[in-house]
């Protein structure tokens, strides 16, 4: 059947196949000798045999064993951590209360593949770092410590600045408060409770009772009404905005007299600026949110 289809006998086909396999043999054997038909020429080493026939180049070995992966640098880090984890997998672990600050995604990208790094790969790194960090501190070796130290966030130790407000040579505390487009600059000093706003009495400048109560609210929060003199300069915005800006400034100025009052003033809300603004009008609407009446026909 084979001879009918190909015109070649089975014995002839096997002979040709053997010849093809013999041609496909390597030029040099493992001992460095040349294969030449019935005999072979002997060489002391394979390099000499290759040099005679022009085979002088050698294959370049990649520096990383993960060279052919999608992200070689990240995979190299993961391989090192996995090897370390397998080595100390039987070590007991403890519940870590405070985890160290590891490198952020952007910082790790500098050594972990750059734009090739994915968020899932970064989460994989954090999982392995936290697992190694959970080993009992009494059993942690230098190898583990040195490896984890490579992934700690580098923080520059800066001297802590004194953020407490200080009184000037006249015993005054200066502060600036803002609300919308209004700004208030106040000087607070211990006294009999006198309050001047732009060289005018409080009742003359703020006609509305609500605005006057807003100005006095920081003093009421610490039970100090009538114990401090306030000299304020306000500008910009409307009357209510100026009153809220003045309240913000007085609250900040009172902290300089007694830092322990900061918690109470903060809970009262006078130390936090109110960033709310009037929402702008939108096209096609009557106001910011109000829509015109819909008519079917």
UniProtKB/Swiss-Prot annotation:
This is Small ribosomal subunit protein uS9m. Belongs to the universal ribosomal protein uS9 family. The gene is MRPS9. It is found in: Mitochondrion. Keywords: Mitochondrion, Ribonucleoprotein, Ribosomal protein, Transit peptide. GO terms for cellular component: mitochondrial small ribosomal subunit. Residues 278-297 are annotated as: Disordered. NCBIfam families: PRK00132.1. One of its GO terms (biological process) is translation. GO terms for molecular function: RNA binding; structural constituent of ribosome. PANTHER family: RIBOSOMAL PROTEIN S9, SMALL RIBOSOMAL SUBUNIT PROTEIN US9M. Pfam families: Ribosomal_S9.
């Amino acid at each position: 059947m084979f001879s009918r289809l190909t015109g070649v006998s089975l014995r002839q086909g096997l002979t040709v196949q053997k010849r093809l396999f013999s041609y496909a043999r390597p030029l040099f054997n493992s001992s460095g000798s040349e294969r030449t038909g019935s005999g072979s020429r002997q060489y002391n080493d394979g390099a000499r045999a290759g040099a005679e026939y022009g085979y002088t180049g050698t294959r370049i070995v990649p520096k990383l064993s993960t060279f052919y992966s999608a992200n070689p640098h990240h995979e190299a880090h993961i391989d090192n951590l996995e090897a370390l984890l397998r080595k100390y997998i039987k070590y007991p672990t403890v519940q870590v209360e405070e985890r160290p600050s590891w490198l952020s995604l952007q910082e790790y990208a500098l050594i972990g593949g750059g734009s090739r790094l994915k968020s899932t790969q970064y989460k994989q790194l954090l999982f392995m770092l936290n697992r190694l960090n959970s080993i009992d501190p009494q059993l942690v070796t230098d190898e583990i410590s040195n490896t984890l130290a490579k992934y700690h966030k580098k923080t520059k130790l800066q001297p802590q600045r004194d953020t407490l407000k200080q009184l000037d040579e006249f015993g005054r505390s200066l502060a600036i408060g803002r609300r919308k487009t209004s700004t208030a600059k106040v000087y607070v000093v211990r006294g009999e409770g006198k309050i001047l706003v732009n060289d005018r009495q409080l009742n003359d400048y703020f006609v509305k009772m609500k605005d006057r109560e807003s100005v006095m609210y920081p003093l009421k929060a610490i039970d100090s009404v009538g114990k401090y003199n306030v000299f304020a300069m306000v500008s910009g915005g409307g009357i209510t905005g100026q009153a809220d800006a003045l309240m913000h400034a007085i609250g900040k100025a009172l902290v300089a007299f007694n830092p322990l009052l900061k918690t109470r003033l903060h809970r009262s809300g006078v130390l936090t600026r109110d960033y709310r603004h009037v929402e702008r009008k939108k096209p096609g609407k009557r106001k910011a949110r109000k829509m015109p009446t819909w008519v079917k026909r």
